[in-house]
């Protein structure tokens, strides 16, 4: 018996092609795509506006399968983290961050990461494999279901019948975080007046485990689904890819699927960045800054976001801040300063709060929009740099850095 094809692996063009190979018209592919992504449906039998003969054929040849959540942890600030089984003893993590006017989902692109950035928990596990498109978009698909964010077929503009899978009783109460005065500026849209139209998940950031641009094809397939009106219909401005700086892939992303861009910078000069972000040895800062300028020619935003983790007595001096001002002088940008989030045996400490404030002030005085990320979810190891999952390392070793989490 043939292994069923997972339809979550296809963007709309891929699904249209797959349907055409079976003698089906393009509109049938779009119908099924709406059921999968808008409504979170997995049972072809429930797709009531799809011909019964096609439903039967799909039940034989296809499936809709997202990663399975094997752990679910909720922080005191409302942040929610899932450990997701992706097979072969590998697990990745996704994080939902609720805020007053938006909900941001941080998703992973690889099981582990080969780039081995010095301050990142994921990199210390080594690398196993790229996630499939289904495993990437499946994180958004699953989070929508678990958070009650899937639309109701009965209430859709297409008039599709069927059960209401959008159980609003499961929607996470964003007010829990608000009551504590929690903020997370660097996850925010730069358009605070924008409304997210009642979506539970209004923004997606590719800032989880792995280097997204090292898994280019599968990530772009997932991005296209996020943007597609037949699937999630997110604005390009509300989808962000974060990269450590793989320059050729940045150029490809600009040409094929330009979304908001964040760059993990973390140092103002090549000597220091070579130590902290080893990919810099291949694509040094001069090439990276030029790639950022090229990206802005087609980007949905008129700036690049530079992420900068604040490491005590490593990259946080006034001189480092002034060097950054010079480095980015010709690149329209904003900075997110990220207080380092500790993990076992990292060898780094977080910069003191006063030093972070002074560092930010130098950037702001130079006219650079600068925010300091409010740490979210660190009590469940969901904060930036703490995502670890479980990875069977094919490059060096097998290390598990997951701490036990309370199940919901």
Curated annotation (Swiss-Prot):
It comes from Aromatoleum aromaticum (strain DSM 19018 / LMG 30748 / EbN1). Keywords: 4Fe-4S, Cytoplasm, Disulfide bond, Iron, Iron-sulfur, Metal-binding, Methyltransferase, rRNA processing, S-adenosyl-L-methionine, Transferase, tRNA processing. Its cofactor is [4Fe-4S] cluster. The lineage of its organism: Bacteria, Pseudomonadati, Pseudomonadota, Betaproteobacteria, Rhodocyclales. The keyword S-adenosyl-L-methionine applies. InterPro entries: Aldolase_TIM, Methyltransferase_A, RlmN_N, RNA_MTrfase_RlmN, rRNA_lsu_MTrfase_RlmN/Cfr, rSAM. GO terms for molecular function: 4 iron, 4 sulfur cluster binding; metal ion binding; rRNA (adenine(2503)-C2-)-methyltransferase activity; rRNA binding; tRNA (adenine(37)-C2)-methyltransferase activity; tRNA binding. Residues 99-379 form the Radical SAM core domain. Disulfide bonds join 106-384. SUPFAM superfamilies: Radical SAM enzymes (SSF102114). Its EC number is 2.1.1.192. It catalyses: adenosine(2503) in 23S rRNA + 2 reduced [2Fe-2S]-[ferredoxin] + 2 S-adenosyl-L-methionine = 2-methyladenosine(2503) in 23S rRNA + 5'-deoxyadenosine + L-methionine + 2 oxidized [2Fe-2S]-[ferredoxin] + S-adenosyl-L-homocysteine; adenosine(37) in tRNA + 2 reduced [2Fe-2S]-[ferredoxin] + 2 S-adenosyl-L-methionine = 2-methyladenosine(37) in tRNA + 5'-deoxyadenosine + L-methionine + 2 oxidized [2Fe-2S]-[ferredoxin] + S-adenosyl-L-homocysteine. Specifically methylates position 2 of adenine 2503 in 23S rRNA and position 2 of adenine 37 in tRNAs. m2A2503 modification seems to play a crucial role in the proofreading step occurring at the peptidyl transferase center and thus would serve to optimize ribosomal fidelity. It is an enzyme of class 2 (transferase). The active site is at residues 93, 384. Residues 152-196 are annotated as: Disordered. Reaction proceeds by a ping-pong mechanism involving intermediate methylation of a conserved cysteine residue. Residues 157-178 have a biased composition (Basic and acidic residues). [4Fe-4S] cluster binds at residues 113, 117, 120. S-adenosyl-L-methionine binds at residues 210-211, 242, 264-266, 341. Belongs to the radical SAM superfamily. RlmN family. Binds 1 [4Fe-4S] cluster. The cluster is coordinated with 3 cysteines and an exchangeable S-adenosyl-L-methionine. It is found in: Cytoplasm. Its main location: cytoplasm. One of its GO terms (cellular component) is cytoplasm. GO terms for biological process: rRNA base methylation; tRNA methylation. It holds the Pfam family RlmN_N. This is Dual-specificity RNA methyltransferase RlmN.
